[in-house]
Amino acid sequence: MLFRSGAGAVGLMAIIIGTRLSPHDVAGSERKRDGVKAPMPRRGFLVFGSMFFLMASSQSMFVTFGSWLEDEFGFTEAGIAGVAFALGAFELLASITSARRADVWGKERSTIAGALLIVPSGVLLALLHTHQIPGLVLLGLFLLGFEFAIVSLLPVAANIIPSAPGRGLGIVLAGGMLGRASMSVIATSAYDRYGIEWPAIIGSISAVGMIACLAWFSRGSRS
């Protein structure tokens, strides 16, 4: 069930990026291109790293929160499913809000704002994980921050190779999938040994890594 939540997030990303592409991008897909693939700019790998860390951060919670609710509070499968459903609605709200804010704040700033919500939420969850209501609220804020960030990061990814937006987006999403796969092993192992505290902390640290990569990318954009 937890992996379905992650798959739902990826599906939502695909829908959102389709709606966020400008008419120029869509028209560009119809233009004839030569056989030479557009190269990935060096700075683009900072966006690749941003996606890696952001998806790793979310995965640290996606693969562990069900076990945490069951072990710590005795949640049944139905109870965990109810929490997952509520979190999905929460994430949808964050996606809509982020899509609006990105046009006002800018894509990079909106992405960093979402990650900045993840960092304290993960740390506080590690400290308050034995308290059900605060823990659930912090889990919701953690995932809200992720959803806010991912919606804003996708247009950045689509624009790193202006002449081939699909290629740029594909490369960056591959970084995200690598982050998810890596964190699935790390987070579950950490949970088995230490409980939810370490996955929550690791998720916060990953969000800091995302902020660092994107801040570096943004600084290069302005120079």
Task: Please describe what each predicted stretch is.
Residues 160-196, 203:
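A late C-terminal transmembrane helix in Major Facilitator Superfamily
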Residues 75-84, 131, 135, 165-169:
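Juxtamembrane helix-start elements in MFS-like secondary transporters
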Residues 1, 69-70, 101-102, 186-195:
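Interfacial helix-cap and linker-helix signal at transmembrane-aqueous boundaries
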